[in-house]
Design a protein with these regions (language model features):
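N-terminal segment of the mature soluble domain
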Residues: 31-77
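A short, structured loop/turn motif at beta-sheet edges
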Residues: 63-71, 111-121
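Surface-exposed short loop/turn segments
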Residues: 75-113
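Bacterial N-terminal signal peptides that target proteins for export
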Residues: 1-10
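Short secondary-structure boundary motifs at beta->alpha junctions and helix caps
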Residues: 44, 121-151
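Sec/Tat signal peptide C-region and signal peptidase I cleavage site
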Residues: 20-26
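Short, low-complexity, Pro/Ser/Thr/Gly-rich segments in the mature regions of secreted, periplasmic
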Residues: 151-160
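Classic N-terminal secretory signal peptides
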Residues: 9-18
Length: 161
């Protein structure tokens, strides 16, 4: 049996592992008692996907901080945009967005540190009651597009980034 060395695969893996990150900025994200969150999907794999995508988004935001700054986020509660509508004939329920009392909301604690010194910290209830009325740079196919835009706005406003 011959073993083939694929330099393009190795190079691609290395670029993906090292590229796109700010070596000096770090983000740590934790989800405190997610089983008690106001609005999370029912299926365990969907819950994992939501938390993974939010974690990755906070990491992208943390990478925008100046080199040497570290962002710590503790997610305390999540209420996703829209409401779940159970579907009897399909394997997945659907999320319906009406723009009424179904806006996205995330409660979190945050801290930005540099060299052991706390630069900013607090607890925030991040929400967007008019989430359907704003321009959204995330495509219609993007998962959690309203939550991501809302977090982008919070990050720009609170952390001036």
């Amino acid at each position: 049996m011959k073993k083939f060395f694929q330099p393009s695969l190795v190079l691609t893996t290395l670029v993906l592992a090292l590229g796109g990150t700010n070596a000096g900025a770090a983000a740590t994200v934790t989800f405190t008692q997610p089983e008690g969150y106001v609005d999370m999907p029912f299926a365990p794999w969907e819950k994992e996907r939501v938390m993974k995508e939010l974690k990755e988004h906070f990491e992208k935001l943390g990478a925008k901080l100046p080199q040497g700054h570290d962002l710590t986020v503790e997610v305390l509660d999540i209420d996703l945009a829209g409401r779940i509508e159970p579907q009897l004939h399909f394997s997945q329920d659907i999320r319906v967005l009406k723009g009424r009392a179904d806006w996205p909301m995330i409660v979190l604690r945050y801290r930005v540190e540099s060299q052991g010194k706390v630069l900013a910290s607090g607890e925030a209830r991040v929400d967007d009651k008019s989430y359907l009325d704003h321009f959204n740079r995330y495509s219609a196919n993007e998962s959690l597009r309203y939550e991501k835009r809302m977090l982008d706005d919070w990050f720009k406003t609170v952390l001036n980034q």
